[in-house]
Design a protein with these regions (language model features):
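Structural signature of FAD isoalloxazine-binding scaffolds in flavoprotein oxidoreductases
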Residues: 92-95
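Short glycine-enriched, charge-decorated loop/helix-capping segments at active-site entrances
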Residues: 15-21
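Short catalytic helix/loop segments, enriched in acidic residues and glycine
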Residues: 24-25
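Conserved A3 ("GATE") glycine/threonine-rich loop of ANL adenylate-forming enzymes
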Residues: 49, 73-76, 103
Length: 239
């Protein structure tokens, strides 16, 4: 089995389009079958595969309706509705990262502006952190952000969170802005679909409870009907 970002035609084994990969109508199952000598190869959208895994054996097990939001290079979305993966009639459903949250906003990798992915992916967080470091240098402000780079000396998705834990206020500003956009998107998803569980996966979810403690209060503040109906359980993905 293969899990890939993008619009996936799982019936015909093709990657129809992936904005962060050079694939358009790529017959990945056929190509891999030829290379590996296997006939029974299946491809699915990576977030859909993650959603199904969580529904079967992870944070959403025992439920019939759940959603996963994956935070990595982009923002992915996987839906399990009535115990079935939902991908739309054209396999393009669930592309949560490309819902617009800011009209005319930041440029997204898909070529459009204002997509949620441009604000809530790990890539977006890295960009925001780099911008903050540059601003601090230009204005002579002290910051611990540069003490929290990865082993290669680059900003990562952990940099701002690690510096915030050291008490750095500039890092806290970055994290708070990032979390605001993330919570806005999650609240909108919950208001539309009202799943039993919404789990957060991908690289940024490695922050675990620290991330959830920041996101959940903002989500609850914007959730429609809190206190009047059962609430969607918000959690970190387990798998």
């Amino acid at each position: 089995g293969v899990a890939s970002p993008g619009i996936i035609d799982s019936k015909n084994g093709k990657i129809l389009h992936a904005c962060n990969l050079p694939f358009d109508h790529y017959p990945i199952c056929e190509r891999l079958g030829g290379l590996l000598g296997y006939r029974n190869i299946r491809v699915e959208n990576d977030a859909n595969a993650a959603a199904w895994g969580e529904a079967i054996a992870g944070a959403a097990r025992g439920t019939q309706n759940s959603i996963i939001v994956t935070l990595g290079t982009g923002v992915g979305g996987g839906f399990v509705i009535d115990n079935k993966i939902y991908s739309g009639f054209n396999f393009a459903g669930g592309e949560l990262g490309h819902m617009v949250i800011q009209v005319g906003g930041r440029l997204c990798g898909c070529g459009r502006r204002g997509c949620w992915e441009a604000y809530s992916s790990a890539t977006a967080l890295i960009n925001m952190t780099n911008e903050k470091i540059l601003m601090c240098r230009n204005y002579g402000k002290p910051t611990r952000l540069t003490d929290c780079l990865d082993p290669e000396g680059h900003v990562s998705g952990r940099t701002a969170f690690d510096a915030m834990k050291l008490g750095d206020e500039e890092a806290r500003d970055v994290v708070n802005e990032y979390v605001m956009y993330l919570a806005n998107g999650i609240a909108s998803i919950i208001n539309i679909f009202q799943p039993e569980v919404l789990s957060i996966g991908g690289g940024i979810s490695g922050e675990g409870g620290a991330l959830l403690e920041l996101v959940e209060p903002l989500v609850r503040r914007q959730q429609y009907g809190p206190g009047l109906v059962p609430l969607t359980r918000l959690c970190i993905a387990e798998l």
